[in-house]
Amino acid sequence: MKFKMVHENYNVFDLEKSMAFYEKAFGMKETSRKNADDGSFIIVYMQTPESDFELELTWLRDMDRPYNLGDQEFHLAFVTDDYEASHTLHSEMGCIC
């Protein structure tokens, strides 16, 4: 029996801001979108051209405050062909801790 990871989901408070971050930081593009008929949620799938793995971003209409991530550690890992350029971009974006 074999398994293949196909996506990872993050709930986001600001969908457009989150999408812009992943596009600028990693070159990800929207591949599909699901809008709930009642407007209660939007799910956006994004991926890089180099991979079929998708990032799923979920926006929930009824969430009225930013998510409290607490002490839960999570991460999304990428490989790059240009470490220095990637490090420079991510430093300029303020997303390196």
Predicted features by range, described:
Residues M1-V6, K29-F78, H87-C97:
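Vicinal oxygen chelate
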